[in-house]
Amino acid sequence: MEVKDILKTVDHTLLATTATWPEIQTILDDAMAYETASACIPASYVKKAAEYVSGKLAICTVIGFPNGYSTTAAKVFECQDAIQNGADEIDMVINLTDVKNGDFDTVEEEIRQIKAKCQDHILKVIVETCQLTKEELIELCGVVTRSGADFIKTSTGFSTAGATFEDVEVMAKYVGEGVKIKAAGGISSLEDAKTFIALGASRLGTSRIIKIVKNEATKPDSY
């Protein structure tokens, strides 16, 4: 797999709580230059970013982030607001308290409501795999499939761990046809990226891959 093919799967991400507009601009410029799938940025920057890229790049943002326990109504509003401001893709965090209470029906209904507001915009569902048992992850693969979401996503990048090969393997085995996989958090090498893609991920959430590609390009033997 060539580097350009990896870059096409990347949601080039900056979600730091202290992110400044010049830093967001750099993310947007790099994402456009390297033709990544999208740039994933805080919701407060979506309107300005959408105007800045002027249709040349998909803008992704997050809702219910990073803990997921805001109410469904709050997440629905966040979704509507983000789309009105120019977001093309929404990454939502599920309410893990519902999961731990065994209330998967509520999780599914919340995703359905948000997908209804997304309409043709892509919806990715963050399940925070590092907080799940294998059984919970398998159940959530079914929940996300039935809800009509476009992607199941491993991680926020703000919890105890990010994506693992094992979790992506489970997702690939149990998620339904038509639902794609996004691996996010801790993807720090091109080899890791290739492995995640080989295991079934079609999107990668990372801030590091472009930095790695830039460093490789500056080496004397690079071309």
Curated annotation (Swiss-Prot):
<dbReference type="Pfam" id="PF01791">
    <property type="entry name" value="DeoC"/>
</dbReference>
<dbReference type="GO" id="GO:0006018">
    <property type="term" value="P:2-deoxyribose 1-phosphate catabolic process"/>
</dbReference>
<dbReference type="InterPro" id="IPR013785">
    <property type="entry name" value="Aldolase_TIM"/>
</dbReference>
<protein>
    <recommendedName>
        <fullName>Deoxyribose-phosphate aldolase</fullName>
        <ecNumber>4.1.2.4</ecNumber>
    </recommendedName>
</protein>
<feature type="active site" description="Schiff-base intermediate with acetaldehyde">
    <location>
        <position position="153"/>
    </location>
</feature>
<dbReference type="InterPro" id="IPR028581">
    <property type="entry name" value="DeoC_typeI"/>
</dbReference>
<keyword id="KW-0456">Lyase</keyword>
<dbReference type="GO" id="GO:0005737">
    <property type="term" value="C:cytoplasm"/>
</dbReference>
<dbReference type="GO" id="GO:0009264">
    <property type="term" value="P:deoxyribonucleotide catabolic process"/>
</dbReference>
<dbReference type="InterPro" id="IPR002915">
    <property type="entry name" value="DeoC/FbaB/LacD_aldolase"/>
</dbReference>
<feature type="active site" description="Proton donor/acceptor">
    <location>
        <position position="182"/>
    </location>
</feature>
<keyword id="KW-0704">Schiff base</keyword>
<dbReference type="InterPro" id="IPR011343">
    <property type="entry name" value="DeoC"/>
</dbReference>
<feature type="active site" description="Proton donor/acceptor">
    <location>
        <position position="91"/>
    </location>
</feature>
<comment type="similarity">
    <text>Belongs to the DeoC/FbaB aldolase family. DeoC type 1 subfamily.</text>
</comment>
<keyword id="KW-0963">Cytoplasm</keyword>
<dbReference type="GO" id="GO:0016052">
    <property type="term" value="P:carbohydrate catabolic process"/>
</dbReference>
<comment type="function">
    <text>Catalyzes a reversible aldol reaction between acetaldehyde and D-glyceraldehyde 3-phosphate to generate 2-deoxy-D-ribose 5-phosphate.</text>
</comment>
<dbReference type="GO" id="GO:0004139">
    <property type="term" value="F:deoxyribose-phosphate aldolase activity"/>
</dbReference>
<comment type="pathway">
    <text>Carbohydrate degradation; 2-deoxy-D-ribose 1-phosphate degradation; D-glyceraldehyde 3-phosphate and acetaldehyde from 2-deoxy-alpha-D-ribose 1-phosphate: step 2/2.</text>
</comment>
